[in-house]
């Protein structure tokens, strides 16, 4: 049984401020495979504080600096492919070969795709030739990222990597019933050398850490994938602080992307 009670905050693995153990079950064996801690408001506040402080310098990094870190992260991810497969297989109870070919590969694929997109992305595009006007794309700020259990590293990569790429800092709350892949990803991020506070991880449940993140005045955006019920609660809780809310709820709200969406 794995002891995974610590959180990743401000570049360090730290003990929870208010211990609240939670057993993670391997569905294939129906046995306890790990013990994590469900975070408290104090833990969330520490992570948000670290992310807010780190944002002041991270937002000023160049595209080239961020690309270098993402490319290093991709190298580490591929080197630890089997570790990621083992983590997901344990938390989901899925067949190992299928997990490697589908779950683990999705994480690497998303990192590769966002690296390519960042390489070509213009953060200050102009309008018509000769126009003095132009658009400046700026990072949103501190992002609260809440991911589901069923495609853990897929959803984590889809939220974390574009946040990195655009100069945002973040707090990740992976699903408490499938937290192992997210914690392993945090190890990879640390090894890649991302500055302290840019990425933080606090385990917890929706009513606890999820509520704290969605209502926190220093969180500028919440991205959530999960149930419609939880999405409604997050939207309501976020309203008082007028933060951006991005929801993918049980297949609701599908997007149609046309061929001319990007130049």
List where the protein language model places each region.
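Rossmann-like NAD(P) dinucleotide-binding subdomain of oxidoreductase/dehydrogenase enzymes
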Residues: 123-263
